[in-house]
Amino acid sequence: MARRGQQPPPQQAPPAQKNQTGKFNPAEFVKPGLTEEEVLEIKEAFDLFDTDGTQSIDPKELKAAMTSLGFEAKNQTIYQMISDLDTDGSGQIDFAEFLKLMTARISERDSKADIQKVFNLFDSERAGVITLKDLRKVAKELGETMDDSELQEMIDRADSDGDAQVTFEDFYNIMTKKTFA
């Protein structure tokens, strides 16, 4: 309670990321050209890059996220992105701000060559496929601890022929939303 003559601190509205039951509600973020499934995918990426679990991404986390998605991420660019998107002045990006950034970036990078570059980041052995081992390596490089079942689920969602590997065609189809399991 505020003392007499003092104003109580301003109350910030909680992020619209969770509904009354405390669960993330992708429907709150759906807009023309963006499906619930796409919102969920971006939320998964957000959670992956929010390595400290604060429900916001700081400059270090944003740089790792952009680099892993195949974008050049110079410090000046990162700070400019945060400045451009940080509507609440926190110096960090919350999910709504991240969603705005990623939907803009995704529309810019749909060319096959750009998608190939991203695929190559994951295909560390240049075998032409992304395996569980490849995903494990990427997660480790990002400082993310994910168990094999979570990583395998990612592979299973993209793998069209059930061989436990993601080909470039599988990856391209997921990235361009031609298929989504």
From Swiss-Prot:
<dbReference type="GO" id="GO:0005737">
    <property type="term" value="C:cytoplasm"/>
</dbReference>
<dbReference type="GO" id="GO:0005509">
    <property type="term" value="F:calcium ion binding"/>
</dbReference>
<comment type="subunit">
    <text>Monomer.</text>
</comment>
<keyword id="KW-0479">Metal-binding</keyword>
<dbReference type="GO" id="GO:0005856">
    <property type="term" value="C:cytoskeleton"/>
</dbReference>
<keyword id="KW-0963">Cytoplasm</keyword>
<dbReference type="Pfam" id="PF13499">
    <property type="entry name" value="EF-hand_7"/>
</dbReference>
<keyword id="KW-0206">Cytoskeleton</keyword>
<keyword id="KW-0106">Calcium</keyword>
<feature type="binding site">
    <location>
        <position position="56"/>
    </location>
    <ligand>
        <name>Ca(2+) 1</name>
    </ligand>
</feature>
<feature type="binding site">
    <location>
        <position position="52"/>
    </location>
    <ligand>
        <name>Ca(2+) 1</name>
    </ligand>
</feature>
<protein>
    <recommendedName>
        <fullName>Caltractin ICL1d</fullName>
    </recommendedName>
</protein>
<feature type="binding site">
    <location>
        <position position="54"/>
    </location>
    <ligand>
        <name>Ca(2+) 1</name>
    </ligand>
</feature>
<feature type="binding site">
    <location>
        <position position="97"/>
    </location>
    <ligand>
        <name>Ca(2+) 2</name>
    </ligand>
</feature>
<comment type="similarity">
    <text>Belongs to the centrin family.</text>
</comment>
<feature type="binding site">
    <location>
        <position position="90"/>
    </location>
    <ligand>
        <name>Ca(2+) 2</name>
    </ligand>
</feature>
<feature type="binding site">
    <location>
        <position position="86"/>
    </location>
    <ligand>
        <name>Ca(2+) 2</name>
    </ligand>
</feature>
<dbReference type="InterPro" id="IPR002048">
    <property type="entry name" value="EF_hand_dom"/>
</dbReference>
<dbReference type="InterPro" id="IPR018247">
    <property type="entry name" value="EF_Hand_1_Ca_BS"/>
</dbReference>
<dbReference type="InterPro" id="IPR011992">
    <property type="entry name" value="EF-hand-dom_pair"/>
</dbReference>
<feature type="binding site">
    <location>
        <position position="50"/>
    </location>
    <ligand>
        <name>Ca(2+) 1</name>
    </ligand>
</feature>
<keyword id="KW-0677">Repeat</keyword>
<feature type="domain" description="EF-hand 4">
    <location>
        <begin position="146"/>
        <end position="181"/>
    </location>
</feature>
<comment type="function">
    <text>Plays a fundamental role in microtubule organizing center structure and function. Component of the infraciliary lattice (ICL) and the ciliary basal bodies.</text>
</comment>
<dbReference type="InterPro" id="IPR050230">
    <property type="entry name" value="CALM/Myosin/TropC-like"/>
</dbReference>
<feature type="binding site">
    <location>
        <position position="88"/>
    </location>
    <ligand>
        <name>Ca(2+) 2</name>
    </ligand>
</feature>
<feature type="domain" description="EF-hand 3">
    <location>
        <begin position="110"/>
        <end position="145"/>
    </location>
</feature>
<feature type="region of interest" description="Disordered">
    <location>
        <begin position="1"/>
        <end position="29"/>
    </location>
</feature>
<feature type="domain" description="EF-hand 1">
    <location>
        <begin position="37"/>
        <end position="72"/>
    </location>
</feature>
<feature type="binding site">
    <location>
        <position position="92"/>
    </location>
    <ligand>
        <name>Ca(2+) 2</name>
    </ligand>
</feature>
<feature type="binding site">
    <location>
        <position position="61"/>
    </location>
    <ligand>
        <name>Ca(2+) 1</name>
    </ligand>
</feature>
<feature type="domain" description="EF-hand 2">
    <location>
        <begin position="73"/>
        <end position="108"/>
    </location>
</feature>
